[in-house]
Design a protein with these regions (language model features):
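Structural preference for solvent-exposed beta-strand-turn elements
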Residues: 1-372
Length: 372
């Protein structure tokens, strides 16, 4: 039975859109597979890791019959990648085998029954649906994702807080040393909904969401339940479990009344930090930032007594302050922006710094000082 017949690039594109969550090593071997279902001309591809489920639909041709199976996702993708993009590929099924043929190449893969594939049971208590352009959500994730914790015992930090309330969508991430917040405006008012998306979900959404570079991106529809979130975009359905726990009160962390404000160019500041980072201690990554009227200086050193010094001219008339930072925390924030100017607000050597963007009121980045 011919399951489908289509160009390599079309099949590969559909597969790659769902394969990002597939774990090669898992206690359930079938989770290394992609579930393939065919209903007439409609092809449905589904993957799962028991926490996240991703599904996409494509019309790629073949006969009009119904069919379902599961096959190793990474092997199927590797085979397709090895073929020319304009190669016509035929997938045929018989018993527990799936045969892939293109040109004079032929591959036969072992399959597992589709009935054994563990689909995620969707929640029954989803709240109201709301949507934003994909490029808006992708931009918000880009602005905060780097501040997520990695394998923190405070599991609620290993993800991003989504808060939808009124006409605002706010994303917040923190690892306890820094906090990033980004906000966008919704088209309609919605009741308050607050969830924590897991780190893996966030990074997969960041990979899949489209923006201007990808052409017509369209909206992403979102719905939140007590223990799940559901997203729909670009013909895909994305369901994920949520992180349980209470996210820290981020409003208490954000400084409100710092008296010293420095506005400077993002690109030259970032370049100076990247150069100074070369000679920081590998373990602590500390730099000293000295700000005084007209001048910002950056200095770093390491255990080998090597030093780096940078100097920038700035328009500043406040107090003279010397403060230490983990240079990686500053570089992460500045690297994930695309603006020309930033504003840094400081109080003293022991208070957290606040970085904002003059023309973008919805972004805030808080970074704790470091004793050097």
């Amino acid at each position: 039975m011919i399951v489908l017949k289509a160009a390599q690039e079309k099949i590969l594109s559909a597969l790659q859109s769902v394969a990002g969550i597939v774990e090669r090593r898992h206690t359930l071997p079938i989770l290394a597979n992609v579930l393939i279902r065919k209903h007439g001309a409609d092809l449905e591809l589904t993957t799962s890791d028991l926490e996240i489920q991703v599904r996409t639909h494509a019309e790629l041709g073949g006969d009009s019959g119904d069919f379902s199976t599961t096959v190793g996702a990474s092997k199927l993708i590797a085979i397709l990648r090895s073929m020319p993009s304009d190669q016509t590929v035929t997938l045929s099924a018989s018993q527990n085998k799936l045969t892939l043929q293109g040109g004079k190449s032929r591959f036969t893969l072992q399959t597992m029954p589709s009935d054994d594939f563990p689909l995620v049971q969707e929640a029954a208590d989803f709240g109201p649906m709301f949507s934003v352009p994909q490029k808006v959500l992708k931009s918000l994730i880009n602005q905060v994702h780097f501040a997520m914790a990695v394998h923190d015992i405070r599991y609620y930090l290993n993800g991003i807080l989504f808060v939808a309330e009124g006409k605002n969508l706010t994303l917040v991430a923190t690892d306890g040393h820094r906090l990033a917040l980004a906000q966008a405006t919704l088209e309609t008012d919605i009741p308050k909904q607050e969830v924590i998306l897991p780190r893996k979900t966030v990074l997969e959404l960041q990979r899949l969401l489209r923006d201007e570079k990808d052409g017509d991106e369209g909206p992403i529809e979102m719905r939140f339940a007590g223990n799940q979130a559901k997203f729909g975009f670009s013909g895909m359905e994305f369901v994920t479990k949520l992180v349980e726990g209470k996210f820290p009160d981020y409003n208490r962390v954000i400084p409100k009344n710092h008296k010293n404000h420095v506005t400077l160019g993002r690109v030259p500041f970032l370049a100076s930090l990247q150069r100074a980072a070369i000679l920081t201690s590998e373990k602590f990554k500390g730099v000293r930032v000295n700000i005084e009227p007209g001048t910002l200086r950056i200095a770093s050193s390491n255990a080998e007594q090597e030093e780096a010094k940078e100097e920038l001219e700035i328009d500043y008339g406040g107090d003279s302050i010397e403060i230490g930072f983990n240079v990686t925390y500053l570089i992460d924030a500045l690297s994930n922006m695309s603006v020309e100017m930033i504003k840094m607000e400081l109080q003293d050597t022991s208070s957290s710094a606040l970085i904002t963007v003059p023309e973008q009121s919805g972004f805030k980045y808080v970074v704790m000082p470091m004793r050097i």
